[in-house]
Amino acid sequence: MSGAEDNKSSHAQLSSQIFLDLVDSVIADVASECHRVARLGLDRDLDIVEEELRLSVEARAKIADPSNNLETNTKYVVDIFGQTHPPVASEVFNCMNCGRQIVAGRFAPHLEKCMGKGRKARAKTTRSTTAAQNRNARRSPNPRYSPYPNSASENQLASGSPGVAGEDCSNFTVRENVKGD
């Protein structure tokens, strides 16, 4: 019976040894890969973590400093990274719809109203639409073709020839001209 027990213990020792070898191999692989990444500087997350740590130390130092009173300096807003920003962006942009100069902080709400989009939009005439209508009116005072039936040139086609292809009817249908009609 001692042979069977020796056999079981040798199997247990063998399986334990194989397991320990596998664990050692995995640890060596992970350690060598981490060393390679750190040595070559390939770990970008490490730079991000170091930058966040530096910024948090600076922010704690600013908060702990009694001479740095954030309430007295209301001209600029300090974000969580310690950077100062003006309360409303002061850069000026030209509206591509109406041509007005708009401060950057009000540009998006202005564009919603100006272009007639968004929840607060309303249909209104802007300078650009008025200018476009004036340009179109000056371009051709007497158009050759008009889709409206009461115009002076209602029987002319886009080419300028008289209405040969079709005849305009009062009920908005087109009747073809056929010989013998």
From Swiss-Prot:
Stretches the record annotates as Disordered: 116-181
User: Can you name one GO molecular function term for this protein?
Assistant: zinc ion binding
Where does the record place it?
Answer: Nucleus, Nucleoplasm
- Compositional bias segments (type: Low complexity): 126-153
Annotated transmembrane regions:
none
* Phenotype of gene-disrupted mutants: Delayed flowering and increased levels of histone H2B monoubiquitination.
Record keyword Transcription regulation present: yes
What PTMs does it carry? Answer: Ubiquitinated in DET1-dependent manner. Ubiquitination probably leads to its subsequent proteasomal degradation.
Q: Source organism's superkingdom?
A: Eukaryota
Q: Which GO terms describe its biological process?
A: chromatin organization
Give, as residue ranges, the zinc fingers classified SGF11-type: 93-114
Which Pfam family, giving just one, matches this sequence?
Sgf11
Q: Which UniProt keywords apply?
A: Activator, Chromatin regulator, Metal-binding, Nucleus, Transcription, Transcription regulation, Ubl conjugation, Ubl conjugation pathway, Zinc, Zinc-finger
**GO cellular component terms listed in the entry, alphabetical order:** DUBm complex; nucleoplasm; SAGA-type complex
Against InterPro entries, the record matches this protein to: SAGA_su_Sgf11
Name the residue ranges with Basic residues bias: 116-125
> Key word Transcription regulation present in the record?
yes
- Which proteins does it associate with, and in what oligomeric form? Component of a deubiquitination module (DUB module) formed by ENY2, SGF11, and UBP22 in Arabidopsis. Interacts directly with ENY2 and UBP22. Interacts with DDA1.
Instruction: State the function annotated in the UniProt record.
Output: Component of a deubiquitination module (DUB module) that specifically deubiquinates monoubiquinated histone H2B (H2Bub). Does not seem to be a component of the TREX-2 complex. Seems to act independently of the SAGA multiprotein complex. The DUB module is responsible for the major H2Bub deubiquitinase activity in Arabidopsis.
Q: Which family does it belong to?
A: Belongs to the SGF11 family.
What is the protein name given in its UniProt record? Answer: SAGA-associated factor 11
What is the organism of origin for this protein?
Answer: Arabidopsis thaliana (Mouse-ear cress)
Gene symbol here is SGF11
